[in-house]
């Protein structure tokens, strides 16, 4: 039987918790399911992207600290997601986790789909109300954008 690999987009929302519980219910105790957790990281503030002259070293240090703080917070979200899936019955070996760096918010859904393809995921799973910060940036629903752009990939939107 063919393995099924799900890319689950996670954040700190209640929608993500419901999504993870649903995925655990569907995928637990099934040898042919693998789950790839993807946490979308927002891009650094613009003032950290542009380096100028003498400020260059100071801005690099500031950017490293910002990335470190963001990654620690996001790692906690991935750890919580992993815990929900494990409690739901998935084996540790069936779960992997990745960051998805969203350099340009207008291409965020494309970046998520690119990660799904690179990790060889058949399906992308997202909560209806997940990634609210991204919805504000793209002036729309990230789940709907994934459905619209996800040609060739199955998209599950969990209410």
Question: Language-model segments: what does each one mean?
Answer:
Residues 28, 117, 148-151:
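Solvent-exposed polar/charged
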Residues 1, 83-123, 144:
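Structural beta-alpha unit
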Residues 144-159:
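Short, flexible loop segments at boundaries between secondary-structure elements
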Residues 1-63:
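Small/aliphatic-rich secondary-structure junction motif
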Residues 22, 73-85, 111:
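Short, solvent-exposed amphipathic alpha-helices that sit
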Residues 7, 34-36, 96, 123, ...:
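A structural signal for isolated positions on well-ordered beta-strands in alpha/beta enzyme cores
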Residues 59-76:
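A short acidic, glycine-rich active-site loop
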Residues 2-3, 106, 123-148:
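Glycine-rich, Arg-bearing micro-motifs that act as flexible, cationic patches
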């Amino acid at each position: 039987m063919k393995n099924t690999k799900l890319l689950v987009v996670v954040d700190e929302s209640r929608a993500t918790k419901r999504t993870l519980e649903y995925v655990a219910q569907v995928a637990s105790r099934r040898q042919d399911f693998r789950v790839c957790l993807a946490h979308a990281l927002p891009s650094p503030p613009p003032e950290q992207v542009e380096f100028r002259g003498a400020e260059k070293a100071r801005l690099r240090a500031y950017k490293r600290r910002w990335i470190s703080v963001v990654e620690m917070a996001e790692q906690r979200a991935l750890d919580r997601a992993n815990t929900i899936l494990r409690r739901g019955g998935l084996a540790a070996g069936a779960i992997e986790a990745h960051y998805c760096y969203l350099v340009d918010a207008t291409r965020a859904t494309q970046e998520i789909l690119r990660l799904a393809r690179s990790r060889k995921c058949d399906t992308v799973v997202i909560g209806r109300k997940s990634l609210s910060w991204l919805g504000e940036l793209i002036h729309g629903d990230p789940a709907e954008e994934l459905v619209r752009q996800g040609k060739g990939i199955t998209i599950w939107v969990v209410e």
